[in-house]
Curated annotation (Swiss-Prot):
Coiled coil: none annotated. Pfam families: PsbT. SUPFAM superfamilies: Photosystem II reaction center protein T, PsbT (SSF161029). Signal peptide: none annotated. GO terms for biological process: photosynthesis. Its main location: plastid. It is a single-pass membrane protein. This is Photosystem II reaction center protein T. PSII is composed of 1 copy each of membrane proteins PsbA, PsbB, PsbC, PsbD, PsbE, PsbF, PsbH, PsbI, PsbJ, PsbK, PsbL, PsbM, PsbT, PsbY, PsbZ, Psb30/Ycf12, at least 3 peripheral proteins of the oxygen-evolving complex and a large number of cofactors. It forms dimeric complexes. InterPro entries: PSII_PsbT (IPR001743), PSII_PsbT_sf (IPR037268). It comes from Magnolia tripetala. One of its GO terms (cellular component) is photosystem II reaction center. Keywords: Chloroplast, Membrane, Photosynthesis, Photosystem II, Plastid, Thylakoid, Transmembrane, Transmembrane helix. Belongs to the PsbT family. The gene is psbT. The lineage of its organism: Eukaryota, Viridiplantae, Streptophyta, Embryophyta, Tracheophyta.
Length: 35
């Protein structure tokens, strides 16, 4: 079960960092494709 917890923490941390960078810099690609 520990591996599951560590994996969840890793994915959540990467997700937070990705969203932080994505919202910090203006997306150069039109986001109309993403609904």
């Amino acid at each position: 079960m520990e591996a599951l917890v560590y994996t969840f923490l890793l994915v959540s941390t990467l997700g937070i960092i990705f969203f932080a960078i994505f919202f910090r810099d203006p997306p150069k690609v039109p986001t109309k494709k993403m609904k």
